[in-house]
Amino acid sequence: MNIMKKRNIFFGLVLMLGLTGCYDLDKMPEGVLSTTIPFASTGEMRNYLDQFYQTGNYKYDYVSFGDGMRAQGFDAGGGQYIAGADTHSDNMASSSVSTRLAGETTLSSAVKLQNYTAIRNLNFMLCNLDNCVEKGSADYNQYVGEAYYFRAWYYYQMFISYGRLTWVNTPLDPNMEEMKLPRANRTIIADSILADLDKAVMYLNTQNNSATMRIHKDVARALKSEVALFEGTWEKYHKAKNDKFFDSTVTDEKIRDYFNQAVAAAKEVMDRGVWAIYNTGNKLDDYRQMFQTTDLSGNPEVLWYKQYDGDQIGNNVNRYLNQGGGSVGVTASLVDDYLTIDGKPFVGDERIEAKKVFGNELRPTLRDPRLSQTVCMPGQQLRPDDKAPYYVVPPLIGTSSYNQNMTGYSLLKHVQIDYTGSLDAEFKGATPAIQFRYADILLNYAEALAELDGVGNAQKIIDALQPLRDRVGMPPVDFDREYNQEADYGFRNLDKYIQVVRRERRVEKACEGRRQEDIMRWAAADELIVGKWPKGALFVGSNLENHPVYGDKLIYDQASGNNLFLTGKPGDPLRYIIPTNPAGYESGWKFDVNRDYLLPIQTRMLGDLTGGMWEQNPGW
């Protein structure tokens, strides 16, 4: 279908353009397009924009800038893809320590800001629109809208990681001093991104499904609600902690404006009445099905996605996760945050007793059914060639390093359990990459309302989250019933409206690669990361300790040669699995709250490329 067509167009385009460069704020795309007058037709505009729809297979690295959309995939230990990126948060843990959470990021690890290359290419197109002889046509408007969307996207991705940037909206003349520009304040960059998204909404066409797999008005609105919510919460919570990461010029009125923009953009999507939470009435499977279905074009929840065919365009999700391993595991922190089936926090003796028989704590008769559709329960089939009794206990020792589970909780979400393609070959899986779904709209809307006025907006928040609850048969939101004030709960001091919405976001979006962004924008590392260390399932004190599947293969509490690590010490009645050797991390993660909320800028960017106009991020 369209996959091969787009792939061939892209390969030809790259050969013509010769896209190269480091940051390239000041260069035009090299070579020629298909004519001597660039973008003379809408066909040429479309072909040019196809490059921004690409995501790696990074073994086919034909572009010299970041992805224009979120890529699906998996590397042993997680990686940066949708299915694995939560290993850089408190949701999942890997066989390797997250350098950022551990406070071990170094200045020498700073990378090129390659998204400026994509921005330069988009600026080149936007500055040559007058060449098009089809100006004003529906196709012309669509592709202009796509260009504005992608420019906003590339700036936003850098903004998340680096904060203040230089806003460049023209291909700069390398002989002019104007390329030597300082970093603008955060709010200027955020406002510029939002302005580009307003233009994208104005130009893009309206679609009622995701069949074209191209951007449309509601996708731009979805990103606008995300950007506005991101910056509103970033400024609010970093300002409240009086750290070095907020815009010192920002006012409370400005912060409220961001929340209002997030509400308005989400409401525009909601008011169309086109999109809906995917719900066939199967409370135990509808949620999971969405993340493993190859073709989502008919799914009413999915605004935009990237389809993988498992052949020309594939990923490694199944390869690494369809035996319960992947050198990762879901954390107890995430598992414990799901409510009970009657809508109460899962705490105290009830939690401990359930964990004494592995899998009982996951049962949909006890817990929110989204949990058993995210984490493997005993009896869960993971591959079409599996033979009963299927998944019995987690593979704490795998048949290979990448088939080992690190916490005792195996990730089920994203695994195509009935996949008919190659199960174990590299880049032969077809797990889809969902970019935006209607749940994102509802969650953004609810969170922004809670930030504006939880009390006054309580019923609107309940109504917005109701479809998410209905899909899995959970009771409606009750802010008092769900309020968790346990001493070990990181958000126990938040007001109940914000706490409930944040939990709902964590649960609904679990293991979709977005948790770290949330922690950073909430300035919540000191509550959730600093001094913490990930743990998993209960081992000592549960039936896992002497399970016959393991026999004598598990080695722990020895001076050397251990292949399993546990909390506590020998003789403790309850000991939990931890993913890595804790030696050197006895005091937990050492995330530096005065430095690690933003990544370091590469030295070359501070000197040669900006003439010394850029300054380094705080703490670096």
Feature names for model-found ranges:
Residues 159-166, 208, 230-239, 451-455:
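Short coil/turn linking the two alpha-helices of tandem helical-hairpin repeats
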Residues 22-70, 354-356, 365, 602-620:
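Membrane-proximal, proline-rich intrinsically disordered regions
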Residues 36, 63-83, 168-170, 205-222, ...:
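Short, surface-exposed recognition loops and adjoining beta-strand edges that mediate ligand/DNA contacts
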